[in-house]
């Protein structure tokens, strides 16, 4: 059996199309143009690529895009002042500070300073607490995208045994909450978990988010399971060749056992920016007292 490939390119395009339709509706019916502000500190090449992609996709969806670039040696107070300004700007519905920040800057203080209503990365403790309480919250984009991808395979996740490998604040913990909201039965595993392969073999859904290339082997996977690979690990090419991007799952092995699987690249990574647009539209609606949009 060869697994169905869950195509991030197709799914993310569908999500962006729904976002664009919702943006058009907000403009036409309410005179609202959702606005996303992205703050980039320093000139990290990978961050530059991400910011350009976010800017392009934001504009393609019909939203307003605001970029703020600061030098790597910017004082913490100046960065905090910019966050306060964006919090107060009615044209801005979403604020994203590109992480990681350069050394010497306090990321936690910056995240805490973002208005939870505009926290489209879903990292502010208020949003984390609301999510854990089953209340409306802006959710970290990668977990949100992971759930959307799983639901292209299964109309309902209710009652399914789901294993989340990884307990980060960015992916693992919010993913557990989203799965609980879907009424899945959830196990969370981490570096201290005993006999991880045995746990994997019991799971109908496996979400791998550990940041270790090809850690999850094919013989760990329950036949027919759905595997969502969140990992993106850059590894040196053979004999000095071009670097490769590998997931946390040994894809070639796992696809012969799983029922459905996401590739790396071409999987969850593409959903992250699409879900950033989703969160921006949701934030705009909530800020203006409108019902949650159909995205």
UniProtKB/Swiss-Prot annotation:
GO terms for cellular component: cytosol. It catalyses: (6R)-5,10-methylene-5,6,7,8-tetrahydrofolate + NADP(+) = (6R)-5,10-methenyltetrahydrofolate + NADPH; (6R)-5,10-methenyltetrahydrofolate + H2O = (6R)-10-formyltetrahydrofolate + H(+). GO terms for molecular function: methenyltetrahydrofolate cyclohydrolase activity; methylenetetrahydrofolate dehydrogenase (NADP+) activity. CDD domains: NAD_bind_m-THF_DH_Cyclohyd (cd01080). It comes from the Bacteria. The keyword NADP applies. GO terms for biological process: L-histidine biosynthetic process; methionine biosynthetic process; purine nucleotide biosynthetic process; tetrahydrofolate interconversion. Its EC number is 1.5.1.5, 3.5.4.9. Belongs to the tetrahydrofolate dehydrogenase/cyclohydrolase family. Catalyzes the oxidation of 5,10-methylenetetrahydrofolate to 5,10-methenyltetrahydrofolate and then the hydrolysis of 5,10-methenyltetrahydrofolate to 10-formyltetrahydrofolate. Homodimer. NCBIfam families: PRK14186.1, PRK14188.1. This is Bifunctional protein FolD.
């Amino acid at each position: 059996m060869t697994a169905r490939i869950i195509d991030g390119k197709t799914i993310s395009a569908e999500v962006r199309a729904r976002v664009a339709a919702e943006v058009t509706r907000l403009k036409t019916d309410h005179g609202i143009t959702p606005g996303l502000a992205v703050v980039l500190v320093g000139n990290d090449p990978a961050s530059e690529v991400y910011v350009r992609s976010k800017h392009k996709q934001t504009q393609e969806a019909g939203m307003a895009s605001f970029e703020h670039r600061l030098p790597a040696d910017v004082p913490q107070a100046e960065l905090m002042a910019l966050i306060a300004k964006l919090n107060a700007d009615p044209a801005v519905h979403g604020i994203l500070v590109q992480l990681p920040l350069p050394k010497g800057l306090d990321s936690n203080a910056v995240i805490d300073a973002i208005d939870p209503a505009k926290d489209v990365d879903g990292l502010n403790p208020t949003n984390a607490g609301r999510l854990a309480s089953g209340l409306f919250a802006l959710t970290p984009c990668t977990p949100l995208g992971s759930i959307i991808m799983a639901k292209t395979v299964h109309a309902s996740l209710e009652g399914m045994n789901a294993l989340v490998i990884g307990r980060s604040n960015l992916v693992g913990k919010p993913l557990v909450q989203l799965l609980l909201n879907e009424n899945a039965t959830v196990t969370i595993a981490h570096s201290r978990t005993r006999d991880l392969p045995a746990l994997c073999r019991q799971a109908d859904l496996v979400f791998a988010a550990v940041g270790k290339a090809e850690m999850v082997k094919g013989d760990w996977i329950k036949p027919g399971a759905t595997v969502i690979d969140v990992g993106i690990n850059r590894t040196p090419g053979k004999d000095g060749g071009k670097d490769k991007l590998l997931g946390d799952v040994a894809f070639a092995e796992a696809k012969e056992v799983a029922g459905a699987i996401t590739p790396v690249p071409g999987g969850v990574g593409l959903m992250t920016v699409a879900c950033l647009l989703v969160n921006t539209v949701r934030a705009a609606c909530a800020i203006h007292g409108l019902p949650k949009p159909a995205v």
